[in-house]
Amino acid sequence: MVMILRRSLINQGADSGAHRTFIPELHTPKMSQGPTLLSCGIMENDRWRDLDRKCPLQIDQPSASIWECLPEKCQDGSLWHQEAVTACAVTSLIKDLNINDHNGNPSAPPSKRQCRSLSFSDEMSSCRTSWRPLGSKVWTPVEKRRCYSGGSVQRYSNGVSPMQRSSSFSLPARANGLSSPCHQSSLHHRFGGQPCQGAPGSAPCGQAGDSWSPDPHPVGGGRLDLQRSLSCSHEQFSFPEYCPPSANSTPASTPELARRSSGLARSRSQPCVLNDKKIGVKRRRPDEVQEQRPSLDLAKMAQNCQTFSSLSCLNMGVDDHSSQSPFALVSSTRSWTALLSASSPGGRTPAGTPVPEPVPHSFDDQFTCQEDLSCDESDGCSLDEDCCRKGDPATSWRDRGACTNSLCSLDGELDIEQIENN
């Protein structure tokens, strides 16, 4: 209701001529235009009940007689007397208020901190908790893996946004309700007989947009709630009974059929469907034919070790002849003859050089000859001994080989290459 109020100045007795429209539903009367007048909104609570609400108060300018400026008539037409007005207004309004400030300055508005403390009390601050980005129960993050072996799923005809094919293709998490019989027929209608490009070997869908589009004719009100979580286990969407293998796929052409009797045959054109299960697995190669390794002959190895040790003893006896007794050479010769007698019956040493059978009586002659030679050398042949020490070890070996009556005829020198090969 729009009321035209006519305000008269009672002291002057003249009309001000100010007419204003006033809507009481929109404008709650507040006396906040004067200096330090009711800035906290106390006028809204109980003071206006004392003054009848049927007679709203309108003030243009603050004046000395601010409480005397009241409308002449109320809505019901009853006149207010000046005595009743002054008694009601002054006693009820100015009793608790100090209109004029001591300094004459208008009061400053409350600070932000005071407003915050007033708007949010201390009792409620104990219940308030700081917001933290917690893990959402509705949307769970799905790791996105890129697949470079093929393109992306084409856009469906009804305008559904295209999905990029990846191994983490996911559907609503609460999909276990799809196993109810009311959803199975609709799923059979929507999911074609073609394995889905994105689901890892198990999620059958005719086209990608068809599985995501809401069912135009839901059976029993069943449709995929796409507002739910978009991550779920892929085992919930394996429906082997709805998608039989195609007619041209045989166990010979698709060997997955024999291995997966319960599941779906994976499309051979999509080699990366199961790449999340094959991370770091190399492609199997045909086994190479390994050559038969020769067995180890331990007896022959022992003979080779004895041969090497005996030859090294012979060389040491030749080099360090000055610091050794003359019987060291005889002992090394005995070990060499023992090695020859223990060799193979074909008369061949492990080095492969042909050796004649040893003559037993010549060994005694050699022993006596060696003793006589050592005695003669110890008596007076010091010059020959020095020459023999300073000479080549090969020539000394030839001299001793000739002295032994070709007991082990190695053609005058050792076959080093054969020894190294063995």
UniProtKB/Swiss-Prot annotation:
Function comment: Acts as a regulator of Wnt signaling pathway by regulating beta-catenin (CTNNB1) nuclear localization.
Positions of region (Disordered): 193-225, 243-269
Keywords: Nucleus, Phosphoprotein, Wnt signaling pathway
Name of the protein described by the UniProt record: Protein FAM53B
Keyword NADP: no
GO biological process terms held by the UniProt record: positive regulation of canonical Wnt signaling pathway; regulation of canonical Wnt signaling pathway; Wnt signaling pathway
Compartment(s): Nucleus
Modification sites for Phosphoserine: 119, 168, 170, 180, 213, 269, 335, 344
Family: Belongs to the FAM53 family.
Chain location of the short sequence motif Nuclear localization signal per the record: 282-285
Quaternary structure annotation from Swiss-Prot or TrEMBL: Interacts with CTNNB1.
Any Pfam family matching the protein: FAM53
Superkingdom assignment: Eukaryota
Compositional bias annotation for Low complexity: 244-269
Gene Ontology CC: nucleus
